[in-house]
Amino acid sequence: MEQKKEILLPAPLFRDPVYDCPTDPTVIWNEEEKMWYLFYTQRRAGAASIGVSWVHGTKIGVAVSRDGGKWLYRGTLEGLEIERGHNTFWAPEIIRAEGIYHMYVSYITGIPTDWDYPRQMLHYTSQNLWDWTFAGRVDLGSERVIDACVYEVGPRQYKLWYKDEDNGSKTTAAVSEDLYHWSVLGEEVTDCAQEGPNVFELGGMKWMISDYWKGLAVYRSDDFTHWIRCADILNESGRRPMDKGWGHHADVVVRGERAFLFYFCHP
């Protein structure tokens, strides 16, 4: 019987070779290339900092891997601009449905030096994860929405969770049957302010993790709607190189009965 090769993952798993600050990761299998793709906010940690300008003006970085252990930086996504100038893209979320990739990304005009600017959710589609077509703004009834998580909760039934900063930074939900038109349901997780929700299934349960700036909050559910708080994770430094401080804004990839958590920290 052929034995599968165990891969020892490096720590850190990936470092952005331009700014060395990849954040808000999302990982998806590229069906066409048979490779793992990592998309992330290419935070400009080494740039001149005027207020919070270094958090803005970010592009979406791309890295690829055949085995999930060794990652190659491939650059940034092109063709996302919807207006002139240097603008801000945060926290990509990508889902594949009926042969089409859908990306939901947080967007801010320009490079603000403070937090007091509108934030929108933009929707793009692609056949190959490189060439993206703008499908429109996602109307969520708020001008300060970021950090999308999209999951198919039933056959052609999709749910979107996101951070609504106009509503106390609570995790809010919307539903859709086609990934283009969304109906807002309202706030869904209200025990604390948080961002970067991520939903997955494992061990017969529905799970949500979110970043509440003291580690990752963990919730479980039977129906993708009513969430029970569990013990936090990544709320202290790890033992591996550069694994310092709390874990932030994570993505989860489920393979069989195992889940792999991708997160970033501030070493």
Could you say what each language-model-derived stretch is?
Residues 1-267:
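Carbohydrate-active catalytic/glycan-binding domains of CAZyme proteins
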